[in-house]
């Protein structure tokens, strides 16, 4: 009985310490513009709609990556008119370009090039000149214990790191007019055993990268 009381007393102390610590989130990021054509300016973004292509990279998160990019653009840069990923897919399928579109993205995975002829037809179906291609380069989750008493974990630090790349393609020339990348790490510390939502980290990454647009 004495041992049991002692154990639960320690548990109570541990919970008290964890409660005092409270939920905590730390956010670190790095974003940079990798390249930009000399003639690609802010006016180019505002003068026409921009379509968002299906994301490449880590397959399980492709839909979320594209949707979170659209959401971030609408929040931070609402003056840029968008054709979001869902609208784009519908328009591409309506134009009977599904097979060509799939081929173009598949070729990109190995060559890093979007075939100009298909890119042009896709842009016409979407009614845009510029197409932004999101790419998820890396997604990593880590967990570490900060407060542990007699093997009982009270506070865990969970972190998520995500790296993304975005390219803006000009369908008229078939070239990349802008390219940028961002890496963010979001760490959460509390007594809840809940992972940091992927959507939250992705949205933060895109917001930091969007700030680098012209």
Task: Describe the function of each predicted region.
Residues 103-106, 152-156:
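Short, structured secondary-structure boundary patches
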Residues 6-18:
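Bacterial N-terminal signal peptides
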Residues 145-150:
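Outer-membrane beta-barrel translocator domains and adjoining extracellular loop/strand segments
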Residues 47-135, 171, 179, 208:
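N-terminal segment of the mature soluble domain
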């Amino acid at each position: 009985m004495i041992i049991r009381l002692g154990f639960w007393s320690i548990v109570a102390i541990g919970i008290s310490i964890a409660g005092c610590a409270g939920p905590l989130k730390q956010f670190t990021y790095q974003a940079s513009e990798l390249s930009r054509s000399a003639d690609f300016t802010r006016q180019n973004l505002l003068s026409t709609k921009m379509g968002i292509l299906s994301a490449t990279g880590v397959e399980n998160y492709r839909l979320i990556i594209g949707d979170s990019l659209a959401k971030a653009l609408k929040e931070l840069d609402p003056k840029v008119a968008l054709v979001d990923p869902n609208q784009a897919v519908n328009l591409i399928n309506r134009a009977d370009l599904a097979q060509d579109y799939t081929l173009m993205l598949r070729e990109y995975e190995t060559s890093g090039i979007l075939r100009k002829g298909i890119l042009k037809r896709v842009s016409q179906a979407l009614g845009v000149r510029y197409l932004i291609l999101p790419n998820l380069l890396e997604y990593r989750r880590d967990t570490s214990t900060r407060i542990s008493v007699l093997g009982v974990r009270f506070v865990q630090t969970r972190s998520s790191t995500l790296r993304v790349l975005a390219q803006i393609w000009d369908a008229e020339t078939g070239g990349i007019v802008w390219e940028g990348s961002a890496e963010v790490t979001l760490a959460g510390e509390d007594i809840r055993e809940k992972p940091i939502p992927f959507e939250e980290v992705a949205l933060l990454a895109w917001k930091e990268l969007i700030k680098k647009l012209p």
